[in-house]
Amino acid sequence: MQNNFTLLAGAALAALSVSASAQDLVVKIGHVGPTSGAIAHLGKDNENGARMAVDELNAKGVTIGGKKAKFELLAEDDAADPKQGTAAAQKLVDAKVNGVIGHLNSGTTIPASKIYSDAGVPQISPSATNPKYTRNGYKTAFRVVADDVHWAAPWASTR
């Protein structure tokens, strides 16, 4: 999770539209996953990893352009439901997040990716494997794991 978060933090910083006070920059990172429903344990684990990464970054005292950056995590539950997923995506876009970690499954990731793309918000899915996610042509959509096509070939060759 730390590597995923580091990638997202870098993407968010590259697209930096942070809120600035006199002293600190605030970098808002969104997290969306199922924290309710049948696979809530996976979403909660993922969110906990993101919270740990935010805490570590804030403890390090990261600076951007000579100003101390404060990272904030805005977490939303999509319950692994596409309708809730798009509502969560819009909520994070409206909150002006700098980047998003999520969604956890392809069924919520794909419809949410258009919302993030339209808003110019980088999105990194830690586990969506449907090839459509990164083949839709959205420049803000990134994946951490291989898609189903890449997973299937090596698996099929061992059968």
Language-model features and meaning:
Residues M1-A22:
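Gram-negative bacterial Sec-dependent N-terminal signal peptides
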Residues A11, A50, A112:
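Aromatic/hydrophobic pocket-lining residues that form π-stacking "cages" and hydrophobic walls in ligand
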Residues G30-R51, E76-P82, L104-G107:
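Extracytoplasmic "Venus flytrap"
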Residues K68-D94, W151-P154:
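Structural motif
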Residues V97-R159:
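Extracytoplasmic ligand/sensor domains, especially the bilobed periplasmic-binding protein
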